[in-house]
Amino acid sequence: MAASPVDAMRLSPLPILLALVASAPLRAQVEPAVDPLAPAPSSAVPLEEIRRFAEVFRTVQEGYVDPIDDRTLMQSAVRALLADLDPHSAYLPATSASELAEDVQGMYDGIGVEVEVRPDRSLKVIGAIDGGPAHKAGLRTGDVIVAIDGRPAGSLRDADPSRALRGTAGTSVRLSLLRPGEALPRDVVLVRQSIALSSVSGRLLEPGYGYLRIGYFEGDTADELKRQLAALQVASGGPLSGLVLDLRNNPGGLLTTAVEVADLFLEGGPIVSTRGRTAASNVLYRAAAGDALQGAPIAVLLDVGTASSAEVVAGALRDQRRALLLGARSFGKGSVQTVVDLGNGDALKLTTARYHTPAGRSIQAAGILPDVTLPGTAIRGLREQDLPTHLAGDAEVPDGYATGVIVEGESAVAEALRRVKQAAAARQATARRATSAG
């Protein structure tokens, strides 16, 4: 069995709220990190418990009222083994594993929505992919899909009810949505399309000041970011004086890609460390020399939809005093998942580490507070700590302060630009004084 270096664009329970490990080469430096409090992994096999499991398996196999094949029974057992661990560990049967691998290629057929499977098997919308059918139809973070094509989501027999959202491009699907604050569901019909996953977009806000949005972190996000940054510099007629980096509603992706993105804007120092029970899970990532903006100020936008790898970038830039954070407290997913190939087409997605920001903070179930709070829409039940069986955090937010805030619209971009211009003006004044003194 081998760990698979794949991204997680799978539309399933918290589909891309992941910081998946990958083996892609990094410009950043990678060092082993040791967690002195982590217990050593045990290789002991609990023989008595395994005998008990075998007895239960045989009893069900032989005596259940209806015949049940061994593979189905074993898959159920493996799912149950992972069910009580944490919401991001999961068993992926071959169909789900192949869909995950398909998503890594940057293209899939569906409606372009990220969802969380709730205990009643309804689907809570985490975010809609820019330009996809769900985004065009106005699906919002916090909407709950209670029925698909007239069938209650709880009645769908598939282990992952979100698979019903997928289908051949050009086919339609009818969703019943329950929106927060509304008593009755609304129906909306969407036409599936081939979703080309472009993770970065950008534009020039005004001469010298750029805007880059990262929708998620996949294999070539850092390269896309470099291309967009170069295009902005050409459009501006030279190096940028400042940048607004928008990570709102970014549910995460590859940890190694997040490291590459943070590394673009840092001259050195730590980016993130991961701490788990195995040697492979304990890693410190450091930035290599070379800041793509040459120190020009950065403002980062975040909200409750900013999760996992996006939180890695925000935390690294803030702890290194490289960026000002604006918006609302982030989601609070501070764990790393590894995908393990089981050799028969099935796979195991297992939480193997917590990550820590350069200042040593774990954001698990706590999130990252912005430096400047912006107004938004408050909705309860959207954060990591609201998920059943979530990993305990070092500094979880008390329930009374756990409301998630969605920060939408261009007013947030305008405020971020104003702050960046202030910082750029101060930087230029400092440079003039230094030149005058010299």
Locate predicted features.
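Terminal targeting/pro-maturation regions of precursor/exported proteins
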Residues: 26-91, 124, 412, 419, ...
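Conserved PDZ fold ligand-binding element
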Residues: 61, 134-156, 243-246
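Terminal peptide-recognition signature
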Residues: 56, 77, 113, 134, ...
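PDZ domains, with a preference for the canonical peptide-binding region formed by the helix
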Residues: 144-176, 257, 333-339
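PDZ-domain C-terminal substructure recognizer with occasional recognition of PDZ-binding tails
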Residues: 124, 146, 160-201, 351
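Bacterial N-terminal signal peptides
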Residues: 12-24
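C-terminal "post-core" interaction segments
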Residues: 30-33, 51, 200-438
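PDZ/PDZ-like peptide-tail recognition elements
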Residues: 76, 88-127
